């Protein structure tokens, strides 16, 4: 896992790119993570990249987090972290684009079968079966909330209780209380089941 002292690196900011498909919640995952960072006392920026807005189309969302005011307003081309919400995207697009070998990738994957698709990436890779967890807890393949649990596992600056509070805020007008609780359960399960790929 990444120690709190190393989170922002030399540039003083953590830049995260979420890659998913329409309907998987990449945009809301970015928004919730930004809320978590803000509630934790950090400066934030969060913005989606709009493309074809249809279910199944690739979707990107970006978050910048820093312990000092963020003065840049450019798009994120060289993220520190890439979060992939659909493993099949490793077969159709370059999910490592702009990610250096010092970077981190977090994948929604059942096992390590994705490795040959991204063998050019030499950084740290973490994975969790976010889709399986979502299906088991909320009954639908919407892996965005389990992925937040994986991010908390990799980056201890993001606390589970703060993530759950942010989810409650985000979903209280959209989901039933029962479904919100199931999403919180999904976050916790993913936190405990996230694994690092061993080279």
Regions found by a protein language model. Name each.
Residues 1-199:
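Active-site cofactor/cluster-binding pocket
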């Amino acid at each position: 896992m990444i120690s709190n002292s190393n989170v922002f690196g030399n540039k003083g900011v953590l830049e995260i790119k979420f890659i998913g498909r329409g309907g998987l919640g990449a945009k809301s995952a970015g928004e919730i993570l930004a809320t978590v960072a803000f509630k934790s006392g950090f400066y934030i920026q969060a913005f989606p990249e709009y493309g074809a807005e249809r279910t199944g189309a690739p979707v990107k969302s970006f978050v910048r987090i820093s312990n000092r005011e963020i003065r840049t307003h450019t798009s994120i081309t060289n993220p520190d972290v890439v979060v992939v919400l659909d493993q099949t995207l490793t077969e159709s697009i370059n999910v490592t684009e702009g990610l250096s070998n010092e970077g981190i990738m977090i994948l929604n994957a059942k096992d390590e079968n994705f490795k040959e698709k991204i063998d050019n990436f030499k950084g740290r890779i973490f994975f969790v079966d976010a889709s399986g967890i979502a299906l088991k807890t909320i009954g639908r393949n919407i892996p965005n909330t389990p992925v937040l649990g994986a991010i908390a596992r990799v980056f201890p600056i993001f606390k589970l209780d703060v993530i759950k509070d942010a989810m409650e805020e985000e979903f209280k007008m959209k989901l039933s209380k029962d479904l919100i609780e199931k999403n919180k359960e999904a976050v916790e399960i993913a936190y405990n089941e996230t694994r690092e790929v061993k080279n």
